[in-house]
Amino acid sequence: LIQNLVSYLVQTRKFTVLDREYLNHMNSELNIITTNQTNIEEIVKLGQKLFSDYIMVGTLQKLFTEEKTIKIKNSNNSVSSKKAFIEFSYRIIDVPTSQIMFSDDYTGVFDIEEKDIVSLEGYIIEKASLEIGSTILNAIYPLRLEKISGDTAYIGQGGLEIVIGEEFTIIELGEKIKDSYTNEYIGREQKEVGKLQITQVSAKLSSGKIFQQSYNL
């Protein structure tokens, strides 16, 4: 599951993901550099590469399948169905402040057609990682319009997150809203001003045609 999440988050081009294998390798290089009394600038450069902005911690709580067979009334025939269930709890922690940026208890339920599946476990994990990865991405980096030219809008996100033909509502952000108790910034005013349909997707950028708007965007 973790490796699938890593692959998903990397292809979004929004995250540089450091895994344990990478960190162990970099720590070994750092030890070599410091032992050989290398220039301090090189040590600083390498040290900077080891720093991460966020840490994800999670627990896979459940992963199982369930099969049900229903007998058709007044017949000797029956119909079987199989579903997969997965539960995964996780948190995204901001390293500098130790604050929990986002947390979620994910539950996935998937219909299974085994004739089309090579690895059942791999199928469940792949489906779940796409949904979890999308939730993480939208929580930390929500989709934004980077540019509007005529009736074409450009979104600063591509990859697996955006699909040609998909439709989105365009939201205009207003004044900031603060929690009256903590004085913490909790969001902004939102106003629906249009809709667009995706026409093109690349690794970093997507574009779509605006087919509905409240005013000339």
Predicted features and spans:
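C-terminal soluble interaction/assembly domains
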Residues: E167-N216
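Outer-membrane beta-barrel proteins
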Residues: V44-L46, N76-S80, I186
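C-terminal/domain-edge helix-coil "capping" segments
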Residues: K83, R91-I155, L160-E167, V201-L205, ...
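Amphipathic beta-strand/beta-sheet edge segments enriched in Tyr/Trp
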Residues: Y54-F110
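Solvent-exposed loop/turn segments at secondary-structure junctions
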Residues: L23-H25, K62-T65, G108-D111, K176, ...
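Short hydrophobic alpha-helix segments
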Residues: E21, D104-Y106, E189, L196
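N-terminal segment of the mature soluble domain
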Residues: L1-T59, V95-S103, V163, I171-T182
